[in-house]
Amino acid sequence: MPSPNDAFSGSGFPTRRMRRLRRSGALRRLTAETHVSPDDLVAPLFVRQGIDEPQPIASLPGVVQHTVESVVIEAKRLASLQIPALILFGVPLVRDAVGSAASDPDGVVQRALSSIRDAVGDELVVMADLCLDEYTDHGHCGIVRDDGTVDNDATLERYGEVAVAQARAGAGVVAPSGMMDGQVAAIRRSLDSTGFEETAILAYSAKYASALYGPFRDAVDVTIVGGGDRRAYQQDSRNAREALAEVRLDIAEGADMVMVKPALAYLDIISSVRAAVDVPVGAYHVSGEYAMVKAAAERGWIDGDAVALEHLGAIKRAGASFILTYFAAAAAEALGA
């Protein structure tokens, strides 16, 4: 007489029951394919010149523009949570056509870098975003010609100057985000020629012209004069193979790490980049992705903490070596740092 199981032998049921390994929390932890820990996280921080106390950012609930003093306190807190890295963005008082404040030794980011390094030493990897848009009066990421277009090669010279200023102030990693052709090579030459051979470069290699950056631009008070956009230098969201070309070029120019930005809408890009290269691959869980979770959670529509961890798990599962996220501190606390 045939066994009752014969009808299922082709599928493996019930010999293999997938639910067996899901029946307890301990089993699920033991067999999980992806793990997110505080070690995977990088905290983006904003530091603003000319304020006496931290200022809330309305479109980024829970995130503030720091003073130099308060950003040091926050850096110490991140270190205590076992978060290994932070990245600084500056909001200067004065802006001009060439973004002079970006390379000013007394600029707000340089002061913050120096103060953080003095306070935490090597407990944290201190990164500095390297771009000009926060510092220019026109809002573009580079030097603008009379016709309103960005002059790629003139911008490279400024990027080199900014990189050296950041490294001299204490940045262990500079992170060029302007998407100029040749930016990594120009920065590497500038760093090496001034004695900063050990300063690493995290290249925003695949940075897309995304609609998800709005809250970030509120945080740094940036708008493009005349209502322009950055589509002439940031990547087209419709393109995937182009990202691999950008990444390979940056690595050939000397990038130590590469990054995909945004993360959630570009998980396929993260996965493709991870499969293609042997350097660490970061991903930026950007301001719009964060703000959507916070807004829905405030309305009681979702469990914001659970969704945040699910997002981070998805980004890690796609292949990210580390994740820049505004949820860094909260996630580290939830993960039991």
Predicted segment positions?
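Alpha/beta enzyme core
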Residues: 2-8, 12, 24, 37-42, ...
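Acidic, Ser/Thr/Pro-rich intrinsically disordered transcriptional activation regions
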Residues: 19, 26-27
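N-terminal leader/domain-start detector
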Residues: 23, 31-34
